[in-house]
Amino acid sequence: RNGLALAQRAKAFDMNLIAYDPYADKAKADALGIQLVDLMTLMSSSDYVSILARVTPETVGMIGTKELNAMKQDACLINTARAALVDTNALLAILKQGKIRAAFEVWDQEPISGDNPFLDLDPLRVLLLPHFAGCSVERITFHSKAAADNIINFLNGIDNGHIFDKNVFDVPAFETHGGILWNS
């Protein structure tokens, strides 16, 4: 959802769009003019790389030394997703070399501490923000409605596809705690 929204905005600036997502719907990507590529092609070809992935066992540390070194001189890495997706030490090292630029608002430890080494980097090459990009009136309204809809669906016995771990129903605690709501 976030990636598609970003792609639509980038298209307005006539950007050439490529993406790496092993689970992407090719037809949707084609309809938006997005070329799907492998991760190394994305890293080596892009002027801007925006990370919008979820943290899963497959994505933790997906951007490391090899991927960062593949980036073009002065390309910009943008991370508004989660810090765990990028190897922090590798990112710090390449930023100290001055090869790439970066903008990010996610940290291994939030809020950022005053002695964080990223604070010593050249502010013309690195934009550091607190984790707040998702805070907008529209986002808050969307999440509030989605939460209410999910609760109503749950109480009506409807699985609307938003249950991340379907095995939760097999956990004994669900019978004792979840069942209280379910049987109400």
Residues covered by each model-derived region:
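Hydrophobic/small residue at the entry helix of a nucleotide-binding pocket
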Residues: N2
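Aromatic pocket-lining residues of Rossmann-like dinucleotide-binding sites
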Residues: L6, A10, M71
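Residues at the starts of beta-strands that form the adenosine-phosphate
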Residues: A7, M15-N16
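Short, structured coil segments at secondary-structure junctions
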Residues: F13, L32, L121-D122
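Conserved SAM-binding motif I beta-strand of class I
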Residues: A19
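Rossmann-like adenosine-cofactor binding region
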Residues: P22-P117
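Rossmann-like dinucleotide-binding domain for NAD(H)/NADP(H)
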Residues: D74-S184
